[in-house]
């Protein structure tokens, strides 16, 4: 065979081999082209799942212990005999409860002279008094007309059925229960809500369409929160 013929044959064989190699690479090339789209789909799925989990967390109420229908005789708290008395139970390290205090501030701005208000700050036994004096303690102290009490071991909270941070009870001047529940629309969210609206109506008009609402906040009696750590993540009720 002439050199020219051998050259043509080599070129033909090279072309065939190259085509075969390209054909064998096609599946992997197609796979790699799908990777960006697959990653985008997985990312969107993860974001959607995260949003659903967050929405469920924010909208799931805590447990609500029943408040006594009459002012508890064993309590050391003073009931006002000339106007309504409000008692709010707070876990001092519950971040959700900032919203509860924000709503309480709105209530007091509208009806401070019509209601006597006390906020109980839970403190487990074995810790110094400063354990409960967090930013929530300071926020409550900045609301005109609000008294603060350190509730050692949650004795008073239990007397009023308070098991979730933010739980609020309202009694009239005769010691009869008018309202019990939370005053936020979800965990950590301020804004118009049935609880605050009902309280304002009860305090100003002595009548309301709502007397019980859900409470959104951390469990008051949670052993996991009883540490010196200033950070406490709100948990869903068990």
Task: Describe each PLM feature range.
Residues 36-52:
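Hydrophobic membrane-insertion alpha-helices, especially the h-region
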Residues 178, 182-238:
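Thiol-/selenol-based redox modules, centered on thioredoxin-like
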Residues 98-141, 152-159:
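Structural microenvironment flanking redox-active thiols in thiol-disulfide oxidoreductases
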Residues 66-84, 103-106:
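A short beta-strand-turn-helix
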Residues 80-104, 199:
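Short active-site neighborhood of thiol/selenol oxidoreductases, capturing the structured segment around
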Residues 91-101, 125-129, 168, 216-238:
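Short, thiol/selenol-centered motifs that function as redox-active sites or metal-ligating centers
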Residues 136-171, 177-178:
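Short, internal strand/loop/helix patches
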